[in-house]
Amino acid sequence: MTSQIKLIVGLGNPGPEYAKTRHNAGAWYVEQLARWHNVSLREEPKFFGHTARIQVDGQDVRLLIPNTYMNLSGKAVAALARFYQIEPEAMLVAHDELDLPPGIAKFKQGGGHGGHNGLKDIIARMGNNNNFFRLRLGIGHPGTKELVAGFVLTKAPSSEQSLIDAALDESLRATDILFKQDMTKAMNRLHSFKAEKV
């Protein structure tokens, strides 16, 4: 396998009241990735989340959606990464991104947490190692910092949700390129995509 990714994490909050909120964009991606590969996510208490395993060119890639609240995401990630001896450089973490508009998604390696509590906890629990890959799923920004908490915990209007969904679809295609070729080609594909309003 050309890709070195061995763990893909989708961030979100647990429970039906959060399932359709913007903050769960990362979890949506992993749910769709599991469907794409015809596997079911199942609860695994020792990893504090729902997990699945897919095979890419004979190599296992683990999928994880933490069952913890967003600000404790690192608990699940660290537990699974330690158990399977997966280094941060072999992890891809999908999360909602305020600094990108709906309809845009981008891969990135390393960097800070940008105020995202899920990323913040993962970095802390991975020994302050931030060198994992991220899939940043644009949800847009409400305009001021004070509005962010309410914004991420509400549903996007259908006009924005359709753009987010289109970017999720393209992210799945880019992930396929990542598996079959490499991150550079996957980035080139994804970073040239912009969903258009219907």
From Swiss-Prot:
The UniProt record lists the keyword RNA-binding: yes
Record-linked Gene3D superfamilies: Peptidyl-tRNA hydrolase
Catalytic reaction equation(s): an N-acyl-L-alpha-aminoacyl-tRNA + H2O = an N-acyl-L-amino acid + a tRNA + H(+)
GO MF terms, alphabetically ordered: peptidyl-tRNA hydrolase activity; tRNA binding
Signal peptide (UniProt feature, chain positions): none
Compartment(s) where it occurs, according to its Swiss-Prot or TrEMBL record: Cytoplasm
Residues the UniProt record annotates as site (Stabilizes the basic form of H active site to accept a proton): 96
Top-rank EC class of the record's enzyme: hydrolase
Keywords from the named record: Cytoplasm, Hydrolase, RNA-binding, tRNA-binding
Transmembrane segment boundaries: none
CDD domains the UniProt entry points to: PTH
Gene Ontology biological process terms from the UniProt entry: protein quality control for misfolded or incompletely synthesized proteins; rescue of stalled ribosome
Subunit structure, interactors included: Monomer.
Family that this chain belongs to: Belongs to the PTH family.
Function: Hydrolyzes ribosome-free peptidyl-tRNAs (with 1 or more amino acids incorporated), which drop off the ribosome during protein synthesis, or as a result of ribosome stalling. Catalyzes the release of premature peptidyl moieties from peptidyl-tRNA molecules trapped in stalled 50S ribosomal subunits, and thus maintains levels of free tRNAs and 50S ribosomes.
Protein name: Peptidyl-tRNA hydrolase
